[in-house]
Curated annotation (Swiss-Prot):
This is Pectate lyase A. Ca(2+) binds at D136, D165, D169. Its cofactor is Ca(2+). It comes from Aspergillus niger. PANTHER family: PECTATE LYASE 18-RELATED, PECTATE LYASE 21-RELATED. Pfam families: Pectate_lyase_4. InterPro entries: Pec_lyase, Pectin_lyas_fold, Pectin_lyase_fold/virulence, PEL. The active site is at R222. The keyword Membrane does not apply. Keywords: Calcium, Carbohydrate metabolism, Cell wall biogenesis/degradation, Glycoprotein, Lyase, Metal-binding, Polysaccharide degradation, Secreted, Signal. Pectinolytic enzyme consist of four classes of enzymes: pectin lyase, polygalacturonase, pectin methylesterase and rhamnogalacturonase. Among pectinolytic enzymes, pectin lyase is the most important in depolymerization of pectin, since it cleaves internal glycosidic bonds of highly methylated pectins. Favors pectate, the anion, over pectin, the methyl ester. Belongs to the polysaccharide lyase 1 family.
Length: 323
C-alpha cells in the first residue's frame, strides 16, 4: 500500500474556513503563492511549476488575456475581475501559470485550451457558461504536467445536455495531470478523460490523472468518465451527482475516501473498465465497477477518510485563495 506521507494541510492546498452549505465560497480566503507545489500525478515527470520565476502580468480584458498567455516563455498571468467574451478557447503556452487574484476572477463565455504544451498551472480561476460550439471550459490535449487547482467551473442545467460541452476534459494521451480542490458544478457532462472508444492506440499507457479534494455538485454525469488510462480519485465530496465515476475501456482507477449523497450510480463500469474502491461512502448508491488491479500510486498522499470529506472539502474547494 502507498506510504501516505504527503500532508495536505502542510502543503497549504486544502484546509481553510469550512462551511456546510452547498457552496464553495469561503468566509476567509487563504493566502497562496505561485511557488506552491503541485501534487498527485502533476508532481511527477520533473514536477509542474508553471511560470514561476518568469515575467508577471495582470490582465482584466479579453485582448490582454489572450496576449499574455501565449508563447512558451515562463510567465505568471494574474486575472483581475470578470472577463466576458463569447469566443473559442484561448490557447495557453507552456511554462505558464494562470492565477485568479480572488473569487471575482472569472472567464465567462470562453475557456482555455492546453494543447501540445507542458508545465501549465491554472489556479483560483472561475470559468463559466462556455457554449459547446466554443469548446470546453478547460481542455487538455496532447499535453503533460498540468495542475488545475482551486478552480470553479460551471454552466447551468437550464438547457439540454449538448448546449455546453465539458467542464474539464483531458484527452489525446495527456499525462501527469492533477485536478484538485476544485468546485465542479451545475452541468450535464462534467469531466472526461479520454474522448473516444476508438482512440486506444493514442491513449493506452497514457492519461495519468489525479482528482483530489474536489467538490462535485448538481452534475448529471462524467464525474469523471475515464477511458483507457490510470486514475486516482480521492478525498472528494459528491452531492446530487446522478452518474458519478465511470471507468471504461480498460481504465484502471483507484477510488478512495470519497462521499456520495443522492447519487444514482456512484461508481460503475462500462466496456470493461476497472476500479479498486477503498473507504468510500456511496450513500444510497453502490459500487458496481469491475474489480481492478490498481492498489497503489507512485506518489505520497494522505486520505482524509470518507466521514471527514464533507467538512474538509465543502467551503474550501473552489476559488477560496487570494494572491
Amino acid at each position: 500500500m502507498t506510504n501516505f506521507k504527503w500532508i495536505v494541510a502542510a502543503a497549504g492546498l486544502l484546509f481553510g474556513q469550512v462551511l456546510a452549505a452547498p457552496t464553495a465560497t469561503s468566509t476567509h480566503a487563504k493566502r497562496a503563492t505561485v511557488s506552491d507545489a503541485a501534487f498527485g500525478y502533476a508532481s511527477l515527470n520533473g514536477g509542474t511549476t508553471g511560470g514561476a520565476g518568469g515575467t508577471t502580468t495582470t490582465v482584466s480584458s479579453y485582448a490582454a488575456f489572450t496576449s499574455a498567455v501565449s508563447g512558451d516563455d515562463a510567465k505568471v498571468v494574474y486575472v483581475d475581475g470578470t472577463i466576458k467574451q463569447t469566443a473559442d478557447q484561448v490557447k495557453i503556452g507552456s511554462n505558464t501559470s494562470i492565477i485568479g487574484k480572488d473569487a471575482n476572477a472569472i472567464l465567462e463565455g470562453f475557456g482555455v485550451l492546453v494543447k501540445e504544451k507542458e508545465n501549465v498551472i491554472i489556479r483560483n480561476l472561475g470559468v463559466s457558461k462556455v457554449l459547446a460550439d466554443n469548446g470546453d471550459a478547460i481542455g487538455v490535449q496532447y499535453s503533460n504536467n498540468v495542475w488545475i487547482d482551486h478552480c470553479d467551473v460551471s454552466s447551468d442545467r437550464d438547457h439540454d445536455k449538448d448546449y455546453y460541452d465539458g467542464l474539464i476534459d483531458i484527452t489525446h494521451g495527456s499525462d501527469y495531470v492533477t485536478v484538485s480542490n476544485t468546485f465542479i458544478h451545475d452541468h450535464w457532462k462534467a469531466s472526461l478523460v479520454g474522448h473516444s472508444d476508438s482512440n486506444e492506440d493514442e491513449d493506452s499507457g497514457h492519461l495519468t490523472v489525479t482528482y483530489a479534494n474536489n467538490y462535485w455538485y448538481n452534475v448529471n454525469s462524467r464525474a469523471p468518465s475515464f477511458r483507457f488510462g490510470t486514475g486516482h480519485v480521492y478525498n472528494s465530496y459528491y452531492l446530487d451527482v446522478s452518474d458519478g465515476i465511470n471507468t471504461r475501456d480498460g481504465a484502471q482507477l483507484l477510488v478512495e475516501s470519497n462521499q456520495f449523497v443522492d447519487s444514482k450510480k456512484a461508481l460503475y463500469s462500462t466496456d470493461d473498465g476497472y476500479a479498486v474502491s477503498n473507504d468510500n461512502d456511496f450513500g444510497d448508491s453502490e459500487n458496481t465497477a469491475e474489480e481492478g488491479t490498481l492498489t497503489s500510486m507512485p506518489y505520497d498522499y494522505t486520505l482524509l477518510g470518507s466521514a471527514n470529506v464533507k467538512a474538509a472539502v465543502v467551503g474550501t474547494a473552489g476559488q477560496t485563495l487570494t494572491f
